[in-house]
């Protein structure tokens, strides 16, 4: 099984590393093309394009200008350990064993506006460029046009290398929109996480994001290989709800905390 997740806006480049091993991102030629576009933007244009504060715009203008594709452990960090949003709180890769990292490297992929597809141990320089950003480029008006079929082709390669045709989509809609399902050589499975509030079950964004990370952790640490095994997911009080599920959409619920 191959797992896809979204990146995070919050980054951590200071806490101790759980592993010293690293790999290089495979789509850096594409990243360099995007950086060339971003380097031409003023901080004011970045603030407007990304709907961020002037302070954040200045930070990211600096990141764009300093970016170069020569990644080392001194100027970059493994992607799985650099991202720090809700998904990554659930994943908690900071306590992974080397065997966990091995399994994750084969079976987990992070989708990225700048890097396209990242493996867990791929080094990454800090950036902010969300997939939904309407950044005009030579291929079109946004990043979806820029990436085209490239992300899908990279996922197909990863599917072949890890040995089956099942993709568990734990990424957000914004990011998975960069994937072309009809060109993906895989059966797509989408877990959905519902939390109870006032007696009704619904998707609550903060909890759902963390649950996507928890599910990723569950697959990695239990070395799951079959879709049927996903139904055993029970971290943090979630349980599988067969009545609301279909073959390719697995619904998990959790009672009010």
Swiss-Prot record:
It comes from the Bacteria. One of its GO terms (biological process) is response to hydroperoxide. Pfam families: H2O2_YaaD. One of its GO terms (cellular component) is cytosol. Belongs to the UPF0246 family. NCBIfam families: PRK02101.1-1 (NF002541), PRK02101.1-3 (NF002542). HAMAP family: UPF0246. This is UPF0246 protein PC1_3665. It comes from Pectobacterium carotovorum subsp. carotovorum (strain PC1).
């Amino acid at each position: 099984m191959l797992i896809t997740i979204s990146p995070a806006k919050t980054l951590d480049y200071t806490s101790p590393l759980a592993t010293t091993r690293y790999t290089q991102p495979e789509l850096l030629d594409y990243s360099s093309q995007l950086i060339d576009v971003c380097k031409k933007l003023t901080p004011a244009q970045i603030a407007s394009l990304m709907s961020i504060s002037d302070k954040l715009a200045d930070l990211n203008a600096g990141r764009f200008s300093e970016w170069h594709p020569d990644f080392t452990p001194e100027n970059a960090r493994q992607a799985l350990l650099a991202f720090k949003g809700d998904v990554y709180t659930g994943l908690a890769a900071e306590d992974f064993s080397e065997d966990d990292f091995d399994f994750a490297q084969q079976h987990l992929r992070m989708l990225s506006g700048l890097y396209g597809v990242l493996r867990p141990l791929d080094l990454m320089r800090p950036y902010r460029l969300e997939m939904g950003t309407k950044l005009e480029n030579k291929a079109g008006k946004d990043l979806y046009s820029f990436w085209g079929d490239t992300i899908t082709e990279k996922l197909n390669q990863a599917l072949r290398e890890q040995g089956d045709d099942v993709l568990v989509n734990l990424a957000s809609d914004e990011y998975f929109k960069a994937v072309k399902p009809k060109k993906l050589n895989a059966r797509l499975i989408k877990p959905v996480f519902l939390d109870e509030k006032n007696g009704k079950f619904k998707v609550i964004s903060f909890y759902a994001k963390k649950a996507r990370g928890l599910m990723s952790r569950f697959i990695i640490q239990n070395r799951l290989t079959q879709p049927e095994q996903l139904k055993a997911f029970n971290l943090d009080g979630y349980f599988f709800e067969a009545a609301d599920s279909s073959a390719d959409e697995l619904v998990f619920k959790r009672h009010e905390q």
